[in-house]
Swiss-Prot record:
Protein name: Vomeronasal type-1 receptor 92
Organism whose genome encodes this protein: Rattus norvegicus
Molecular-function GO term, any one: pheromone receptor activity
Task of the protein: Putative pheromone receptor implicated in the regulation of social as well as reproductive behavior.
Keywords, sorted A to Z: Cell membrane, Disulfide bond, G-protein coupled receptor, Glycoprotein, Membrane, Pheromone response, Receptor, Transducer, Transmembrane, Transmembrane helix
Main location: membrane
Annotated glycan sites: 157
Length: 308
């Protein structure tokens, strides 16, 4: 029993720490890029995508914090409406995060494409096309996740093994094998498509970086080889985030299938939640640390606070 209590406490501290740190980091990233976006005469699409991604991740972590409260604290039970609304919103925001990360990769691939490339003709209209694609994918996610509005219920008082644990107040109704297979296949195809798109765009950017490095070595230019351009730094940042995202996605699926295999209702579920929200927590730190103007803003703010 003591071992279970210790694991429960560790999971609770880890989850709330992840949520609080992620909310703080995404808030800083969101407001910093929003100020840049509003302060520019010609707003850069890159700032718009970072604002969208950080806002989505911020709301996702806030929603996750509310769900975590119901998982670990007995502050009164929810009825079906809060359960359905929060779980549905949480599922949507997770899908939106994947879409935003994928489309950021695609946008940067189009931005870096040379004039001779077939992608160059999309440069001027890429923000409009990508925004339209994002809205289309959002509507698609909303329709595919709509079954949660009827599958999620308030956990009944009676003890039963037919309900799948979600939180203390919420449970998932069992579905037929055909419905489960349909939803699982649809989700797998959708996410495989988006991750494949991310992988292709990342491969394209790696090729461009390699060519740029070869050209710099050929020209024997120390200025090109010793100091990376803002485009190269941004490309490395996005590639790093892409690699991190894929690793976490694979790890999350391993934990999910372990949960299904061992029929564990809480332990593997908590680990899965922590892993699945790690990207939303860590990615803003990657952007903050790799963008020079962000570090300058934070240093100036810290200096002003210290001087006060």
């Amino acid at each position: 029993m003591n071992k279970d209590n210790t694991l429960h406490t560790i999971m609770k501290i880890t989850m709330f720490s992840e949520v609080s740190v992620g909310i703080s980091a995404n808030s800083i990233l969101f407001f910093a890029h929003l100020c840049m976006l509003l302060g520019e005469n010609r707003p850069k699409p890159f700032h718009l995508y970072i604002v969208s991604l950080s806002l989505t991740q911020l709301i996702l972590l806030i929603t996750m914090g509310l769900i975590a409260v119901d998982m670990f604290m007995s502050w009164g039970r929810w009825d079906s409406t809060p359960c359905q609304s929060l779980i549905y919103l949480h599922r949507l925001l997770r899908g939106f995060t994947l879409c935003a990360a994928c489309l950021l990769n695609v946008f940067w691939m189009i931005t870096l494409s040379p004039r001779s490339s077939c992608l160059s003709k999309f440069k001027h209209n890429s923000p409009h096309h990508i925004s339209g694609a994002f809205l289309f994918l959002c509507v698609l996610y909303m329709s595919f996740s709509s079954h949660l509005l009827v599958s999620i219920i308030a956990t009944p008082n009676l003890t039963s093994n037919i309900f799948m644990y979600v939180t203390q107040s919420c449970s998932l109704l069992p579905m037929s094998y055909s419905r489960t297979s349909t939803f699982s296949t649809t989700i797998a195809i959708r996410e495989a498509f988006l991750i494949s798109l991310m992988a292709l765009s990342s491969g394209f950017m790696v090729t461009l970086l390699w060519r740029h490095k070869k050209q710099a070595q050929h020209l024997h230019s120390t200025s090109l080889s010793s100091k990376a351009s803002p485009e190269r730094r941004a490309t490395r940042t996005i590639l790093l985030l892409m690699s991190f995202f894929v690793v976490l996605y694979i790890l999350e699926n391993v934990v999910f299938y372990s949960r299904m295999k061992f029929k564990d209702g809480s332990m593997f579920y908590c680990v899965q939640i922590i892993v699945s929200h790690s990207y939303a927590t860590i990615s803003p730190f990657v952007f903050i640390c790799t963008e020079k103007h962000m570090t300058k803003i934070l240093r100036s703010v810290c200096t002003r606070i210290i001087n006060i």
